[in-house]
Structures are given as C-alpha cells and as structure tokens.
C-alpha cells in the first residue's frame, strides 16, 4: 500500500492552488510566491516511520511520523498544526488541524503519477507530480 508512493516526485501541474492557499489564510505576497514554486517531494519509509521531504529554491520542509498517530507539524507557510496521516482505499490521507480550522490533503497514485488533492472548506486544488 505504501510502496507506490515511495521515491522522489516533481510537480508538473497545479490547478486552483492560489485559491486554496488564500483559503488557508496565506497573505498575498507569500501566496503568489507559493504559486510560482515547483517543489519536489521525497517519500520514504523505514518499516516504522514515514518521512516526507518537500523542497524548493525558497524553502524545505520535512515531516517524520508513524501512520495513524497524530503529530505536530510546522507547514511551509509557518502554520503550527496537528497532523494525522492514514491510508484509506489506496490513498494517503493527511488531515491538518489548527485554530479551529481543518484542511485535508489526499495523495493517490493515478497512471504512475502522484495526484494531490488539497481541500479547505469548499476550495479544492489538484496538483500532479511525476516520478523523478
């Protein structure tokens, strides 16, 4: 279930991302920068913990966690959140909660690409990554 996600991925397309980060509450200037960045993502698993590293010319983030266990995360836009990542139906589902708000990040493999659907309230962004 985890194996298809493992490896390094690069962003190849992004739809509605600016509206999504606006819904998160990201200010105008950082939001515009976020939309220009083409990050790469590396996902690894050591049998107990999973690591997700996201990198770009502007910022690098890394999270290390056990599936199904809540953990604290500082996001790329500096939000301090409680995250929970689980696997459901072949998808990796991440729920971030902070200050009474919640966003869901759903990662799935479709035709060899990683499709990431980010949802906040009624705003959905779809980002597609291909394996490097």
From Swiss-Prot:
Q: Does the keyword Lipid biosynthesis apply?
A: no
User: Any keyword Transferase?
Assistant: no
Residues modified as Phosphoserine are 13-14, 40, 42, 44, 91
Question: Where does the UniProt annotation locate this protein?
Answer: Cytoplasm
Q: Name one GO cellular component term.
A: cytoplasm
What InterPro entries does the record point to?
A: Calycin, Fatty_acid-bd, ILBP, Lipocln_cytosolic_FA-bd_dom
Record-given protein name: Fatty acid-binding protein 9
Organism placement in taxonomy: Eukaryota, Metazoa, Chordata, Craniata, Vertebrata
């Amino acid at each position: 279930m985890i194996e298809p996600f493992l490896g390094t991925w690069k962003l190849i397309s992004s739809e509605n991302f600016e509206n999504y980060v606006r819904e998160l509450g990201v200010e105008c200037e950082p939001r515009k920068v976020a939309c220009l960045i083409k990050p790469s993502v590396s996902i690894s698993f050591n049998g107990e913990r999973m690591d997700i590293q996201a990198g770009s010319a502007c910022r690098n983030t890394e999270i290390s966690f056990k599936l199904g266990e809540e953990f604290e995360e500082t996001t790329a836009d500096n939000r301090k959140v409680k995250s929970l990542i689980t696997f459901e139906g072949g998808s990796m589902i991440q729920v971030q909660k902070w200050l009474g708000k919640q966003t869901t990040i759903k990662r799935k493999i479709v035709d060899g690409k990683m499709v990431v659907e980010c949802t906040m309230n009624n705003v959905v962004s779809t980002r597609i990554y291909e394996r490097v």
